[in-house]
Amino acid sequence: MWLSPSLLLLILPGYSIAAKITGPTTVNGSEQGSLTVQCAYGSGWETYLKWRCQGADWNYCNILVKTNGSEQEVKKNRVSIRDNQKNHVFTVTMENLKRDDADSYWCGTERPGIDLGVKVQVTINPGTQTAVSEWTTTTASLAFTAAATQKTSSPLTRSPLKSTHFLFLFLLELPLLLSMLGTVLWVNRPQRRS
C-alpha cells in the first residue's frame, strides 16, 4: 500500500523539521544570588513551548516553568523564563539561590511526538554574587562567560510514550488510520459474480 507524503506527516508529527537544542553543560551560582542560563534551539520552533525542569532523570524531571508560546516572560516562584524567538534563544533565571538548588536541570522544547532537551548541571557556592551564562555569537560557534563551562551538552529526546501530545495524537490518529485501512480493504475486496 502506498502512503502519500501528507499522510506520513499525519503519522509522524514533529518529525518533519530537524531540531536541536543546546546549552551549557555546567553553570555555577552563588547562594542568595541569581543564575541565568540561555539555551538555543533550531529554526522552526519559535512558537513552541520552552521549559525548564529539575531532576537527573529526563523522563521524570519536575517542570519548574514553561513559556506560553510568545516572547512574554513567565515567572513561577523563583524561576522565570523568556523566549527570544528572533534569536532562537530562551533564557531561564533562578533567583535567591539556595544550596539545595544544586541539581541537574533541563532546558527543553515541547513539541508533538518527542520533546527535545539538554542537561545543565547547576552547582551552588557559598557567597552572594550573580552568575550569568551568556551566549555570544562568533563565527557560528557558541561561547559562555566564565560562569559556565565552555562546552555544550548533546541533546536528548524525551520518550514519546511519556508525552501527552504523543498520546493525544496517537489516540486521534489510530481510529483515522484504521478506518482508512478498512476502506481500502473494503474497496479492494473480491467481487462475487452471479
Swiss-Prot record:
Forms complexes with the CD300 family members with exception of CD300c. Residues 1-18 form the signal peptide. This is CMRF35-like molecule 5. Expression seems restricted to cells of myeloid lineage. N-glycosylated. Belongs to the CD300 family. Residues 19-165 are extracellular. Residues 187-194 are cytoplasmic. One of its GO terms (cellular component) is plasma membrane. It comes from the Eukaryota. GO terms for biological process: immune response-activating signaling pathway. The chain crosses the membrane at residues 166-186. It is a single-pass type I membrane protein. GO terms for molecular function: transmembrane signaling receptor activity. Glycans are attached at residue 28. It holds the Pfam family V-set. Disulfide bonds join 39-107. Residues 19-125 form the Ig-like V-type domain. PROSITE patterns: IG_LIKE. Its main location: membrane. InterPro entries: CD300_family_receptors, Ig-like_dom, Ig-like_dom_sf, Ig-like_fold, Ig_sub, Ig_V-set. Gene3D superfamilies: Immunoglobulins. It is found in: Cell membrane. Keywords: Cell membrane, Disulfide bond, Glycoprotein, Immunity, Immunoglobulin domain, Membrane, Receptor, Signal, Transmembrane, Transmembrane helix.
